[in-house]
Amino acid sequence: MKKLSYLLMIVAIMIPFVVCSAQSTSQKSVNSPVVEVLYFHVPQRCKTCVALENAAKEVVNTRFANDVKSGKVKFKEIDLNTKDGEKIGDKYEVAWSSLIIVRKDGKKEKTANLTDDGFRYAVNNKVKIQGLIADKINEFLK
């Protein structure tokens, strides 16, 4: 009988620690920033536009595969000729093919426009633009 009493006492003491630990873990995942890689386009795309989209997708899906699975990193292709696409384009002040990386942390947003670098490097230096994209994603995940 004494053993059972001691066991129940130990369990009763441990319950608050387990509950607190579970709450702090779930709060960390809720408060983690989400990074969205937004590729904006119009229906007619040039060679450079296609190369930029492919480079960005490849970085997100290969280097950040685990973050994509967990929902921390997302790639979104946005057609500016749709109502939703136009609305999102207006929000980020985009009117043509562009690459915007967004860090969302609660109600706060921070953006980085990699369009100029994207058009500079997408065709002739894919490794360079992919490095810039990866660096910005890593920075925004912190």
Language model: regions and residue ranges:
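Local sequence-structure signature of Cys/Sec-based thiol-disulfide redox active-site neighborhoods
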Residues: 31-62
